[in-house]
Structures are given as C-alpha cells and as structure tokens.
C-alpha cells in the first residue's frame, strides 16, 4: 500500500513518540517526510536510520514556541521538495509544575503553553494553506488530546489549548474545504510513549487501563495509523472531525463491577 507515493509530508515533533511512529508509518507507505523537531540531534539520528532503509526524509530544527521557526520550516520544505501535501501538527505538551489547577496555575506560562499547543498549529496551517491551494489541495491533521474534550484536576492550560485545536480544526475545514483542503484532528488518550512510560508509574497505568473499554492501553502506532488514514485519500469525505483514540476511556462514566 503506497497511499503517500509522491507526497510531501511535514510532521512536527517527528523524532519521538507519536511523531516518530507517524513518520515510520507514512514512509512505509511511500511518503517523503520532513522530520521537524526541537532536538536536531534526535532528528538527524532518526533521519539517518530511515534513510539507511531507503526512505526519503529531511531533518530540520523546529521550535514550536517561535513564529520565526514556523516560517523557516515551510521555507525549508519548499526549498527541498517544492511542494507540501500534508501537514501533521503533532508537536505539543505542557509543564506539569506550572500548568496545575485554575487556582494555582502559573499565568506567566499562559503564552508559552498556548503558543506550543495552539498558536503554532494555527500559524503553520496559515502558511501551508496558500501552497496547498495553488497545488490543487492538501491535508492538515492536528494532534489534539482528550484533555481538550474532558477535564482533569490539573493541566488546565493544556486542556484549554487543546480544546482550541479541536475547534480550530473545524474552522480550517470550513474555510478551506472548497479549495480541496481537508483538516481533521486526532485526540489521543493515554498512549504509551517513552515519555508516558518514564513519567507514569505502573499504578497510574493500571487505573487508566481499568477505565478503558479495551483490555490494553494505546501504543504510538495506534495514533499513527489514525493520522495516516485521515491524511490519505481513504478519508477523502471526512473533514472537520476529531477522532478520539483512547480505547474507549471517555465513552462512559467511571464504572465498577458490582457483580
């Protein structure tokens, strides 16, 4: 299956976690990927690994908190490949020590958190839309989070910014659909990325597993498969949607077995 043959795909935060899995999935289907990551060292190493396997990829430094870096990423891609068919806005995150509950969160962190999770997605999309329009169409896939749909005891800024990503997805889809540009989002739940494995102990993982409808937690490749589907022609009649990838975590109230 070569759904991305002759396609140029930008993936932000591409050197690790969901981004790396998405990169592997797309190059396995013939896509050429710009590996944009804050860690140039990791991006270079990842690109070398994929290139040795025959993939056509380009690593580039990218800082999601700098608008200048967003513009440089698009310029780099056009210089290297001359086209952009898919943009995957994957990069995001938060600082748990500063992004707490509404009473105690650090408001000085607001701009950085929203720039990382929302402004970057908006600006990169703004930059690629004219390019995609000139080419006759394209795809944008945003990585949101179930934190943008539900709420938690902490991570207030993260949740609010990811909710913005979900609604931004609808706006982009509405405003660019007639230009043959689709825009969708994925909202992962707990995914066993290296970061999650390092920061969440076994007890926490068991709690999440107990509330999932599936007998297992998600892996990065589960999200990557969904992103690849949305970015491909298989999803040609889907736009403005957010696909939740959480093993059914958010489909029900907290439950216990009384039998």
Curated annotation (Swiss-Prot):
Its EC number is 1.1.1.159, 1.1.1.-. The active site is at residue 158. Optimum pH is pH 8.5 (NAD reduction, bile acid oxidation) and 6.5 (NADH oxidation, bile acid reduction). Induction: Up-regulated by cholate and after the transition of the cells from log phase to stationary growth phase. Belongs to the short-chain dehydrogenases/reductases (SDR) family. The gene is hdhA. It holds the Pfam family adh_short_C2. One of its GO terms (biological process) is lipid catabolic process. 7alpha-hydroxysteroid dehydrogenase involved in the metabolism of bile acids in the gut. Catalyzes the NAD(+)-dependent oxidation of the 7alpha-hydroxy group of 7alpha-hydroxysteroids, such as cholate, chenodeoxycholate, taurochenodeoxycholate, glycochenodeoxycholate, taurocholate and glycocholate, to the corresponding 7-oxosteroids. It catalyses: cholate + NAD(+) = 3alpha,12alpha-dihydroxy-7-oxo-5beta-cholanate + NADH + H(+); chenodeoxycholate + NAD(+) = 7-oxolithocholate + NADH + H(+); taurochenodeoxycholate + NAD(+) = 7-oxotaurolithocholate + NADH + H(+); glycochenodeoxycholate + NAD(+) = 7-oxoglycolithocholate + NADH + H(+). The record marks 162 as: Lowers pKa of active site Tyr. This is 7alpha-hydroxysteroid dehydrogenase. Homotetramer. Is relatively thermostable, retaining 95% of initial activity after 1 hour at 65 degrees Celsius. Glycochenodeoxycholate binds at residues 145, 158. GO terms for molecular function: cholate 7-alpha-dehydrogenase (NAD+) activity. Keywords: Bile acid catabolism, Lipid degradation, Lipid metabolism, NAD, Oxidoreductase, Steroid metabolism. The record marks 145 as: Transition state stabilizer. PANTHER family: DEHYDROGENASES, SHORT CHAIN, ESTRADIOL 17-BETA-DEHYDROGENASE 8-RELATED. It comes from Bacteroides fragilis (strain ATCC 25285 / DSM 2151 / CCUG 4856 / JCM 11019 / LMG 10263 / NCTC 9343 / Onslow / VPI 2553 / EN-2). NAD(+) binds at residues 18, 37-38, 90, 158, 162, 191-193.
